A protein has these predicted regions:
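Detector for Asparagine
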Residues: 6, 33, 63, 76, ...
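Generic alpha-helix detector with strongest preference for long hydrophobic helices that associate
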Residues: 8, 93-101, 154, 158
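A short helix-turn-beta junction within AAA+ P-loop NTPase domains corresponding to the substrate/partner-engaging
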Residues: 1-16
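Conserved AAA+ ATPase small/helical "lid" subdomain
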Residues: 13-113, 120
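Terminal-proximal interaction/regulatory segments of ATP-powered molecular machines
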Residues: 118-198
Length: 198
């Protein structure tokens, strides 16, 4: 049927993005080009969606000192000074473990972008003017099993990864609140001193 065309083409497999900040940027671009209502997207929503996508694409590390979440953060360039993580070694191990290459399997950016768009439409329908990471997680959870591109045998593992992302979001949200409260306390102190001086 298309022999002449097929003779002149060569398939090149290209892996998904493995840095979740870059993945989040893909979703932002998709939303800018999508026909969805403009609304406030709460902090961490895109990053946590990206983190979920990356977790489904990377191979679980062999050693006990680096977990899957730490590996995803290391790939993103987030290594604490005290951590002894060799990103190059992690990538080599991932390549050896993967069927073709690390990043060739997992949830697609299209699936995640579509679910974010659905979550926005759902929030609009419910009269909300914002999109929270929790509603994005709920959409992932509800639709993982029913999506044709996600093999049934991966669903339970992906749901486990989603729980890791929920916990990471919770920690980041708590840290944001701590930071905001600490800032407000200092600001209150300065304003109080300024008031007393004048």
């Amino acid at each position: 049927k298309m022999e002449a065309f097929n003779d002149r083409t060569k398939r090149i497999d290209f892996p998904y993005v493995l840095e979740y900040q870059q993945e989040a940027e893909i979703y932002r671009k998709m939303l800018r080009n999508a026909d969805v209502p403009d609304m406030h997207i709460e902090p961490h929503a895109m990053e946590m969606a990206g983190l979920f996508g990356v977790l489904t694409r990377i191979e679980e590390p062999d050693n006990d000192r680096v977990g899957l979440l730490q590996k995803a953060k290391a790939y993103n360039g987030e290594i604490d000074d005290g951590d002894d993580i060799d990103v190059k070694q992690l990538r080599e191990e991932g390549e050896e473990k993967a069927d073709i290459a690390e990043g060739m399997d997992g949830v697609s950016a299209r699936f995640i972008g579509d679910e974010i768009a659905e979550a926005i439409m759902d929030a609009t329908h419910r009269g909300r003017g914002y999109l929270s990471p929790l509603s994005v997680f709920s959409h992932f959870e509800e639709n993982l099993e029913n999506h044709g591109s996600i093999p049934e045998e991966n669903v339970d593992r992906y749901l486990r990864y989603l729980e890791l992302v929920r916990e990471e979001y919770k920690e980041r949200a708590i840290e944001n609140v701590r930071h905001a409260l600490a800032y407000d306390v200092d600001e209150i102190q300065r304003q109080g001193e300024k008031y007393m001086d004048h």
